[in-house]
Amino acid sequence: MPLFHYVGGWEIDQKLIIVSLLLSAVTSYGSGIEHRKKGYVDDGLIRRALYGAIPGAMIGVTFVMITGTDFKSIFKILSVVVVGFVIFKMVRKVIYQQSNLTAGKEAQLGKMTLLSCFGGFLSSVMAIGAGMIYVPAMKFFGNLEARKSIGSSLNIMMVVIPFAVVAHFLILDNNQVENLFDESVLLLVLVLTNFLGSKFGAVIGFSMFSEDFLIKLFIAVLSITWINYLFDILF
């Protein structure tokens, strides 16, 4: 969403949410399938997380409908808070090199499901895959190692995001639907490039990049996004 809004000049509305969610879904499929091939998933925890994530996504769609014209401001404030919190937690992990040993610990399924519900909500409201929520939920409450946390998170998104896309599409007005179809060629190109990029990116990541490097790269990307939202609110 930030790329379309700040670079492409698109307005933050339900049309942009649908496009951003569509690309997030395609990315999750491209990378999620590769993680599944390697066995980096836990289907039991994925099913449990979906009990929270799918209702959360529906609640998020309802929230967007209710807030109406106030949605843009609420979106940016919520983005600053949530993305800022995620950056803070990840930076702490890098600085202190915290080792979260999961062996022998019992999964906290209630907390994992609740956090997954929040992830589904953010998917609909912030137009993101919500991996920033699902991965910690899988790792810290599901007690999965890093690769399985990422793979399970992607497989959750493969199910949740299509629900949010359909729900948002059903409440578009006629003008937004026409505008969306006018961009069909661009969307097709973006879908193909995102799918191939995420697929090959996952394969390369398995063999070439350490978890520490990927975390630092993710922090850098999130920080740029956070600064954009903050400046937009303040100025």
Residue ranges: model-predicted function:
Residues 1, 19-32, 63, 99-104, ...:
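Hydrophobic alpha-helical transmembrane segments
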Residues 1-15, 133-148:
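Interfacial segments of multi-pass membrane proteins
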Residues 2-14, 30-119, 170-235:
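Juxtamembrane transmembrane-helix boundary motif
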Residues 11-20, 42-48, 143-154:
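Membrane-interface alpha-helices at helix entry/exit sites of multi-pass transporters
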Residues 17-25, 50, 54, 153-161, ...:
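Transmembrane helix-bundle signature of multi-pass membrane transporters/permeases
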Residues 103-135, 141, 154-161:
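Helix-loop-helix "hairpin" substructures at the membrane interface of multi-pass membrane proteins
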